[in-house]
Amino acid sequence: MIGQLEHLARRGLFLFDPEAAHGLSIKALKSGLVPSCAAPADPRLGQTVAGLVFSNPIGMAAGYDKNAEVPEALLKIGFGFTEIGTVTPRPQAGNDKPRLFRLVEDEAVINRLGFNNEGHGAALARLKACSREALIGVNIGANKDSADRIADYVTGIRTFYAVARYFTANISSPNTPGLRDLQARESLSALLSAVLAARDDEARKGGRQVPVFLKIAPDLTEEGMDDIAAEVLAHGLDGLIVSNTTLSREGLKDRRQANEAGGLSGKPLFEKSTAVLARMRKRVGPHLPIIGVGGVCSAETAAEKIRAGADLVQLYSCMIYEGPGLPGRIVRGLSALCEREKLASIRDIRDSRLDYWSGRNV
């Protein structure tokens, strides 16, 4: 019955422009119209990562709930954690519309939204109303016209410190001109120094250390990956998120929209993002937490991220095609995998296909 409702809801939403459909889905979650398909708790899926206790490894990626409108509603439908944002200090409209495109044949999305959001103030007010137990991360970015982008990230740390369970510094969106330049070694070193100094200062004041993750692009050279790994380890960062959207259009079936500018996400991103994940795991070693994201559409693809080196997994675009029951289905599938393979913990499969994925030429 739930599957039929999801199918009908998807058909209805696909009658709308993608951005309008996104807004309607937020309203549905706010109103409680989305039924919970959460899976039963399974201790084999729980784990502690970066000092945080996760009930299951499946999270909602940043980009869906940009303004912190529905974080707790997302947790109720089966996600183990959720990440709001990207939020910038000042509100900004983002790029001109249309800026969001469905590639239905590929089960993919191209976006050039450009960090459209209501700013720190609006998101902070909403997060203050959330339970302190809710596992909500805050994805921070810089305003497009900022004179000092690093200062914008520092402002994000200080503004949300009391309400964030973790932070993600997003330096890998392709839709803010020059933002990916912060992945270059000298710039990245300056950013990490400033962000972690702000975090440590806030921790001294409040007695609680909030972990900071870095979200990177999948379109990195081998040298670029070397530089990021070196700086992340040198600065003692808490973790990585691999990866953001790609500029590549390789292998797409839907050629009508493939030439739209912006970042590609969804199923076609899976192989590329998973290969980069494995290569980064090889570079940073076994202990640094990594969240794998990109093309996760099923329990099998989620498990494959873990086999390639991820501790946790996020998704977003595939839920557009699979519906709000997707996180629950994935969690049930991971429980079934643990049962089938007699695993004490889902962590037992981590890195089991690390060599395969790190060697993939994608």
UniProtKB/Swiss-Prot annotation:
<dbReference type="GO" id="GO:0044205">
    <property type="term" value="P:'de novo' UMP biosynthetic process"/>
</dbReference>
<dbReference type="InterPro" id="IPR050074">
    <property type="entry name" value="DHO_dehydrogenase"/>
</dbReference>
<dbReference type="GO" id="GO:0006207">
    <property type="term" value="P:'de novo' pyrimidine nucleobase biosynthetic process"/>
</dbReference>
<comment type="function">
    <text>Catalyzes the conversion of dihydroorotate to orotate with quinone as electron acceptor.</text>
</comment>
<dbReference type="InterPro" id="IPR005719">
    <property type="entry name" value="Dihydroorotate_DH_2"/>
</dbReference>
<feature type="binding site">
    <location>
        <begin position="316"/>
        <end position="317"/>
    </location>
    <ligand>
        <name>FMN</name>
    </ligand>
</feature>
<dbReference type="GO" id="GO:0106430">
    <property type="term" value="F:dihydroorotate dehydrogenase (quinone) activity"/>
</dbReference>
<feature type="active site" description="Nucleophile">
    <location>
        <position position="173"/>
    </location>
</feature>
<feature type="binding site">
    <location>
        <position position="266"/>
    </location>
    <ligand>
        <name>FMN</name>
    </ligand>
</feature>
<keyword id="KW-0472">Membrane</keyword>
<feature type="binding site">
    <location>
        <position position="175"/>
    </location>
    <ligand>
        <name>substrate</name>
    </ligand>
</feature>
<dbReference type="GO" id="GO:0005737">
    <property type="term" value="C:cytoplasm"/>
</dbReference>
<dbReference type="InterPro" id="IPR005720">
    <property type="entry name" value="Dihydroorotate_DH_cat"/>
</dbReference>
<keyword id="KW-0665">Pyrimidine biosynthesis</keyword>
<feature type="binding site">
    <location>
        <begin position="244"/>
        <end position="245"/>
    </location>
    <ligand>
        <name>substrate</name>
    </ligand>
</feature>
<feature type="binding site">
    <location>
        <position position="243"/>
    </location>
    <ligand>
        <name>FMN</name>
    </ligand>
</feature>
<keyword id="KW-0285">Flavoprotein</keyword>
<keyword id="KW-0560">Oxidoreductase</keyword>
<feature type="binding site">
    <location>
        <position position="215"/>
    </location>
    <ligand>
        <name>FMN</name>
    </ligand>
</feature>
<keyword id="KW-1003">Cell membrane</keyword>
<protein>
    <recommendedName>
        <fullName>Dihydroorotate dehydrogenase (quinone)</fullName>
        <ecNumber>1.3.5.2</ecNumber>
    </recommendedName>
</protein>
<comment type="similarity">
    <text>Belongs to the dihydroorotate dehydrogenase family. Type 2 subfamily.</text>
</comment>
<dbReference type="InterPro" id="IPR001295">
    <property type="entry name" value="Dihydroorotate_DH_CS"/>
</dbReference>
<feature type="binding site">
    <location>
        <position position="170"/>
    </location>
    <ligand>
        <name>FMN</name>
    </ligand>
</feature>
<feature type="binding site">
    <location>
        <begin position="111"/>
        <end position="115"/>
    </location>
    <ligand>
        <name>substrate</name>
    </ligand>
</feature>
<feature type="binding site">
    <location>
        <position position="295"/>
    </location>
    <ligand>
        <name>FMN</name>
    </ligand>
</feature>
<feature type="binding site">
    <location>
        <position position="66"/>
    </location>
    <ligand>
        <name>substrate</name>
    </ligand>
</feature>
<dbReference type="InterPro" id="IPR013785">
    <property type="entry name" value="Aldolase_TIM"/>
</dbReference>
<feature type="binding site">
    <location>
        <begin position="62"/>
        <end position="66"/>
    </location>
    <ligand>
        <name>FMN</name>
    </ligand>
</feature>
<comment type="pathway">
    <text>Pyrimidine metabolism; UMP biosynthesis via de novo pathway; orotate from (S)-dihydroorotate (quinone route): step 1/1.</text>
</comment>
<dbReference type="Pfam" id="PF01180">
    <property type="entry name" value="DHO_dh"/>
</dbReference>
<comment type="subunit">
    <text>Monomer.</text>
</comment>
<feature type="binding site">
    <location>
        <position position="139"/>
    </location>
    <ligand>
        <name>FMN</name>
    </ligand>
</feature>
<feature type="binding site">
    <location>
        <position position="170"/>
    </location>
    <ligand>
        <name>substrate</name>
    </ligand>
</feature>
<keyword id="KW-0288">FMN</keyword>
<feature type="binding site">
    <location>
        <position position="86"/>
    </location>
    <ligand>
        <name>FMN</name>
    </ligand>
</feature>
<dbReference type="GO" id="GO:0005886">
    <property type="term" value="C:plasma membrane"/>
</dbReference>
